[in-house]
């Protein structure tokens, strides 16, 4: 809508959970590979194979970008979401690589997302993002282009003056895949949490 960037900060007033920025590619790939043990239809296995293939084949940022494009553009993805929701993901111990970058097992995040947004491909995109818990008084900062979603809790959101909103799923509104791919920062990295000064 306008040329302004939109960095944001969320300040937690209550216990708060957010998804923000991408987890390491190996962790994301391991999360999707967990789905291979399920009884999936050939169509869902094809989509899952394309996602995992993209995560293996390119540099990290290109791999994450390509995987998001596949998830959001393949018309068979809602079927994969539904099948994984029915079968569930087995919970794994905290040290498992698929849990890297997530405060909880990604299986829990997926269950929460499909409960609120059934059939939505964004539930799979959510598995690719860092899950960050905030305590009251903590804040999370995000540069422009960092994909994020707020899961629960109450907070104060502060952002630069901009009308720009590009969605990556978890919505009934239009998802502009081309625009999302053009402006999203697909580099993985640890979220920037700011703790309150206790002085």
Please state what every model-predicted region is.
Residues 1-138, 148-199:
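Active-site region of the double-stranded beta-helix
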